[in-house]
Amino acid sequence: KLNCNQKIALVGVNGSGKTSIIKLLLRFYDPNEGVILVDNKDIREYTVESLRKCFSPMFQDYCNYAFTVRENVSLSDYNEFENEEKIKYALDKSGAKGFVDNFPGKINTYLTRQYEDGEELSGGQWQKIALSRTFFRDTVMYILDEPSSALDAEAEDELFRQFEDLYKNKGAILISHRLSNVKSADKIIVIDNGKVIEQGTHKELMSLNKKYAHMYKLQAKKYE
């Protein structure tokens, strides 16, 4: 069950089914059993188009397009292609505005060396462009699948600070292996082999002292 003003985190080991849940939510395919409720309504009662308008997802395997920065960002809502203020806002929230402002053509700069004057980006910079595309779209809920996997610690910290501002009046689903990033979620759902084995707040799951607490303590040891 999903309420559109919630901040939800999905956690679990690789292959546990976290991304599959997102694909079910977006109706890339329908469940063989059980139901998914969005605002107390079975998602199969929505048209695919109307359902997907509610979400702005970023998957781990996002694409790097050999387009301009403007085109890369506005792909999620091409009707707003000319809205420079909105593009710059999305770039700022993702942390991409700093390096884009240094390009000679700013947001009209082509990306990749396929173009004579194109700029080649690092993995972390491409990830910020993909995040900008997600944030550019007016939506009810963001879906972020490992959104900081290519970022350094400082950039990751700043990104999650920006998330807090973006989330104020919207919902979010976050998948992250770094459990320190999900502590503030309204609900943390622990997935194992395609099944929900625990759910609750960070405090509640730590007090259970089961799978989530074990994973969190293992990660925390690395920073002692």
Name what the model sees in each region.
Residues 1-224:
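ABC-type nucleotide-binding domain
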